[in-house]
């Protein structure tokens, strides 16, 4: 009888066993393997498995499944259960999975997870992959019991390469057991330790901005500028906002904000993350704002360079006109984010008594040194009891120099008569060093100088920028020497651009202005030239004879004369009467305005009404002067 009962019971068990799903066998094998790998302490703290537990699978991690107690109260569909936490206070899952990351309602954002056909339909393919870590009170199962084979589960796990952040930190909650790390970590550690893995070199002490792309897009050091998993990520709206920055468990090593390789464009750039410009704007990805600000800093300077038109000249370009015209760029306050020629920054507006390149080094072009300043520097406001030797001692640290002032040889005095002097440096680089040592106030440069009775008296330093010697206002007009005037007595601080603006305001039609400089030191000589584009403006200027120059502190009455050339032929005989020689005389009267040789001058000006005209001749320094004509 007992044998019959045992046989009937075994047959009944055999009939029930095929009805069990294959997932139960897989689950039983998984439990046995996990129990073997777990330490005794973990097995003791694990609660017994209840037969009514409900199997659940992560909507985003098909290879990651777990069990959950069946809900006792009405709730949302299981598709939402993986996104929001159940309200439990279990911190073991968070601490053991991603230490140091502050979860938002129990969830975290993952932008590097691939889309999968098992993704929950709530999210869909157009949403950024997210993983909601629900707080569980039961042991988590790392493999899906419904997986067709074991190889697929391990393949899917290997795709999620985030193991540097995953740790095997034991659970601190008595209500949860440590997720058996044996199968998971053993599969991942081998992949993370390979040299070909680009993420394996991440160190715990690095800047969190350079961390793996968790919530902040693609991380730094990715071999491709695009996301290798989801290159064309679409705009999405989500109820989960992950913090773009997070604190790490390990201490951060102090690092400079701007590094030497900050502006590298290769994969070695560790400061500026690669940014996908083809991706639509992501309102929840705050990291794009940080990248945009950094891109603004390292953007090229083409918009500023575009301000240089025909009216400007750069030392590396061809001359705009026959004259060696140069830009009139500002000379002070050169910025480190824009390291190019200061001529690009000139705009002819506002106070430009100082230019923007004073502290910049000497430029070199094609191996040749390009000078920016005159070697002659004006120094004003000197102490009255300072002599030549003391002035030399005060400025010798910038380089060899000679101290000079007007009529020094005739006066035989060791003291500057009017409190100013000129410093003649041997090298132009000494002038730049002097400028760098000065203090700027109200657009002027000052340096403290001491005398026997006065200690640290500020004196004004006024260098001359070579780019201020010429200014082209209208580059489309050709320069006509016969429409050019000479301006005598120009104050030395006045620049070419300021002279052009004054003359254009008075007479109009100015196309060029220049300041005469000596050929050796290239310092202003106190005269200038202005070329007009039409005859009316030219005649109006020479007819006035005197002009009041007013600009800032400058207010001086200067003389205006026609600009006389010494290589012009006679306008009457074209050299036939004078043997082909150049005409020595120019008549500045508005009825003539011509060059004459001696024979033609006598012939033309013997007529009634012209006998009182005085010829102009060119003398040294481009200065025309009236000479009496000796009638024969």
UniProtKB/Swiss-Prot annotation:
Q: Low complexity compositional bias: what residue ranges?
A: 13-48, 170-193
Q: Would you kindly state one Gene Ontology biological process term found in this protein's UniProt entry?
A: regulation of dendritic spine development
Gene Ontology annotations for the cellular component aspect, listed alphabetically: apical dendrite; CCR4-NOT complex; cytoplasm; dendrite; neuron projection; nucleus; postsynaptic density; synapse
Q: Name one Pfam family in it.
A: CEBP_ZZ
Give this protein's Gene Ontology molecular function annotations.
mRNA 3'-UTR AU-rich region binding; mRNA 3'-UTR binding; mRNA regulatory element binding translation repressor activity; RNA binding; RNA stem-loop binding; translation factor activity, RNA binding
Record gene name: cpeb3
Question: Which keywords fit this entry according to its UniProt record?
Answer: Activator, Cell projection, Cytoplasm, Developmental protein, Differentiation, Nucleus, Repeat, Repressor, RNA-binding, Synapse
Residue ranges occupied by any RRM domain in the UniProt entry: 375-466, 483-565
Stored CDD domains: Bbox1 (cd19757), RRM1_CPEB2_like (cd12724), RRM2_CPEB2_like (cd12726)
Localization, UniProt = Cytoplasm; Nucleus; Synapse; Cell projection, Dendrite
Quoted from the entry, the domain comment is: The N-terminal Gln-rich region is required for the formation of amyloid-like oligomers and for the stability of long-term potentiation and spatial memory.
The subunit field of the Swiss-Prot or TrEMBL record says: Following synaptic activity, forms amyloid-like oligomers. Aggregation requires an intact actin cytoskeleton.
Where does the record place Basic and acidic residues bias? 1-11
Region described as Disordered: spans on this chain: 1-89, 127-212
> Can you name this protein?
Cytoplasmic polyadenylation element-binding protein 3
